[in-house]
């Protein structure tokens, strides 16, 4: 006698771990690019994040009297830690990433019951809380190290992360101040603060958008794009969410360029100067907090693109990917409810 079960009809205990591992592998080129342009601080943040994430997952497993591998082997906590570590400034104080990992795993993930139960993307919950609570530390990005007169050594990187200054006593903001013509360390931040004074052409001709610095941000985004396309090719993620997110943002940004020329950065600069590619392929596609229906994925991705556009163009935060993902997460139950495909043989 056969047992009747509903789909899915294939099961694998290591399917989640395989998914998470592929996502992390696809992030490695961008991680390498980020370390190349911003120095050793990237690896230090990743090391702290991964170490603490594994420790928390083990502790939660013991508290719930589950096998240690129950929470650790699925790699979800490790992936969350890696995403958050890449998202914060490489030379942010160590306690920033510590608070972020605790919030992401304990508050945003395990307080809901663990993997598969959380309503919001854990890494983005932590990032948004850190950005609102510690704006100075979370905006302390350094320019690419090749633009600095004295790039931080590995010892300087450790000193910056754990004490706030290099071995010579320079803080991140003092190192940034040594580079002429740069008011903020990221292109979107600089454009936000300099647009009224310099205009679009002046901003695009400033050091932050020319030469090595511009190439640094572009190459990091191109690496995320390549990794995302790999995930689509391997069918780890679906194409609908990133396509809808990028398409909606590009459409609205392009219309703004046509209707209000010379008031904002052009579409290409907007797409490749912030966290857009990272968000589209590695954050918005989180299978737990994203929509699960084919039409729902398109709506979900389009909503994120819309929110990013509104916040970037009319809000106070220059990037806005984290807040946009969280706002779209709120809409997921409603989206899934109204986009469920009709079952074969059922009525309208």
From Swiss-Prot:
Family: Belongs to the NqrB/RnfD family.
Protein name per UniProt: Ion-translocating oxidoreductase complex subunit D
UniProt source species: Actinobacillus pleuropneumoniae serotype 5b (strain L20)
Protein location: Cell inner membrane
Any one GO BP annotation for this protein: electron transport chain
Record Pfam families: NQR2_RnfD_RnfE
Cellular component GO terms, alphabetical: plasma membrane
Assembly and interaction partners: The complex is composed of six subunits: RnfA, RnfB, RnfC, RnfD, RnfE and RnfG.
